Amino acid sequence: MRNIFIVLIFLFLSNCSEVKAQDKKYEGKQIIVQEPLQNNKTPQETNQESINSATKSVVHNNDNNQTEEVLIHDSREQKKPEIRPTKVTFKIDDNDMVLGNKKSNVIVVEYFSPTCPHCAYYHQTIFPELKKKYIDTNKIAYVIREFIATKQDLDAAILARCKGDINSFIQFHNIILQQQDKWAYSNKYRELLTDIGQLGGIPPEEYKQCLNSDKITATLIANTNLVAKAPKFIGTPSFFVNGVQTENYSIDNISKAVDKALDDETKKQINF
């Protein structure tokens, strides 16, 4: 009997040990599960952090892609379009300022702006040679037209056209370009232009009347709007030989275009 009692006690103690071991094992599992939450954040907050992290990664990748696209786009934009000959119809009208032979079949149209530094350079260095070769020899009709980009351009162009004749126009045209650095960028440009006009024989009151002339202003705006429609017009100075725009304003390029136009006219006359 005593032996049976001892066996029962042994079995009871063994059973308790197994329960305690299982409890300890279970408690270990609970600790493992709870470890990610030891930073006092709820499961929802932890999940939100994961979402935010993933979002930042996606945005970062998109930014890299967009940067690459911008670089590719910029590299395409840096490629300047090639200027190809573009035919534009230009006819000499009564308001044009023409040098040379008005009846010539070769018409060279120059577009300039009074405040354009490149235009001033052209007229002081390249134009004299062109004038000697083609204008003084009456081979071409050379038309000078204004492209108005600023208020200074408008006021200066009006001064040059104030008298209305070609000689007065050329006189003021040359002075305005030669003195460009003195008046074009001054806050008192109107006063300086008035002084230039007075020295050239245009009193202040007469210049004021010209500034208020709708006819002169309309002519200048019409000239500007016409060339602005040319597909390859890229600014001043620009030149059109029988309606075809030249590559640039070098003496070689302009002479090449003029010589070709003269040769074409000669061939037409022979065939006729």
UniProtKB/Swiss-Prot annotation:
InterPro entries: Thioredoxin-like_fold, Thioredoxin-like_sf, Thioredoxin_CS, Thioredoxin_domain
Family designation: Belongs to the thioredoxin family. DsbA subfamily.
Keywords: Disulfide bond, Oxidoreductase, Periplasm, Redox-active center, Signal
One CC-aspect GO term: periplasmic space
Key word Manganese present: no
Domain Thioredoxin residues, every copy: 74-263
GO terms, molecular function: disulfide oxidoreductase activity
Pfam families with a match to the protein in the record: Thioredoxin_4
Signal peptide: 1-21
Subcellular location(s) per record: Periplasm
Main location: periplasm
Chain's role: May be required for disulfide bond formation in some proteins.
Disulfide bonds listed in the record: C116-C119
Full protein name: Putative protein-disulfide oxidoreductase RP025
Top-level taxon in the UniProt lineage: Bacteria
EC number: 1.8.-.-
